[in-house]
Design a protein with these regions (language model features):
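Residues forming the flavin
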Residues: 1-280
Length: 280
């Protein structure tokens, strides 16, 4: 019983401002170069994706996501039109700075034995975390970012991994590797020594990496360049959107329901609303 209209563009919502509160009562749609007004008996549902394909909105709300070299993924029409339409009638948009950013460094699983370090040679996360959580932490670091591995754990990385991160350096010792990566003197060695002590007692008190993935880094070493923009593949999409009740009713800035207006999908800020907590 659904009347599907193709090649029709929703332009704006129709608002009835009479009475104690505004109500969405319809929609203006352009079809065949002509505007048509449609009455919505029960309401309008905005379900038009996020804004990952809108460079202007990304720059305004989530510049960290598009921080050089990351790759937007989604429908080409994820341009934020539904979110903006809801905002135009007072809908509250929340968590617009949040997004899912993947660091698809496994498979092979052996890469999880390594450690991520930032431009100061410091570790910043447990490497057995969900790849989206790692991505969220990675873009907040001082660049460059490297994944430090034993060469024996490199295995079939070149054929099995989606990451495509280039080799940034190799070394028989940590000092050799750090010099090639131009990291602060002594920083990488201190980080790896701390990590290896955690491996000895099978307890990562800093980031709580689990036992099966705790393995000594004892060389020879290889470093993968995981800096966005330097060759690695980092896909992302947005998580922010219109604030709604559990029934999908859009809320205004005061937290009051806008009657007759609903949002769903990425147009709404749904259950997965933070990059560091997203999982699929």
């Amino acid at each position: 019983g659904v009347d599907v209209r193709c090649e029709a563009r929703a332009l704006r919502l129709i608002v009835d401002r009479h009475g104690p509160g505004q109500r969405i009562v319809g929609l203006v749609v352009r079809e065949d170069m002509t505007e048509h007004h449609y009455r919505a008996e029960k309401g309008v549902i905005l379900c038009a994706g996020g804004f990952v394909m809108n460079a202007e909105m990304l720059e305004r709300y989530a510049p960290e996501l598009s921080r050089g070299g990351t790759v937007p993924i989604g429908n080409p029409n994820d341009t934020g039109g539904g979110i903006q339409m809801g905002m135009s009638v007072g809908g509250r948009a929340i968590n617009m700075h949040e997004g899912f950013l993947s660091v698809p460094f496994y498979p092979p699983a052996t890469l999880t034995h390594g450690i991520f370090v930032n431009g100061q040679g410091q570790r910043f996360i447990n490497e057995d975390a969900y790849h989206g959580r790692i991505g969220c932490a990675l873009v907040k670091q001082t660049f460059p970012v490297y994944l430090i591995l034993n060469v024996e754990d490199y295995t079939d990385y070149e054929t099995a991994s989606w990451l495509q991160a280039p080799v940034a350096g190799t070394g028989e010792t940590l000092d050799e590797l750090a010099a090639e990566l131009k990291l602060p003197e002594g920083a990488l060695a201190a980080t790896v020594n701390t990590y290896n002590r955690a491996v000895d007692v099978q307890e990562d008190s800093l980031f709580h990496k689990r036992g099966p993935w705790l393995k000594h880094l004892d060389g020879p070493f290889v470093a993968l360049n995981c800096t966005p923009g330097d060759g690695a593949f980092f896909p992302y999409f947005t998580l922010g959107g219109l604030d709604t009740t559990v029934d999908g009713e859009v809320l205004n800035n005061e937290g009051t329901i806008i009657h007759g207006l609903f949002a769903a999908g990425r147009t709404a800020c749904g259950v997965p609303r933070r990059g560091d907590g997203y999982a699929s």
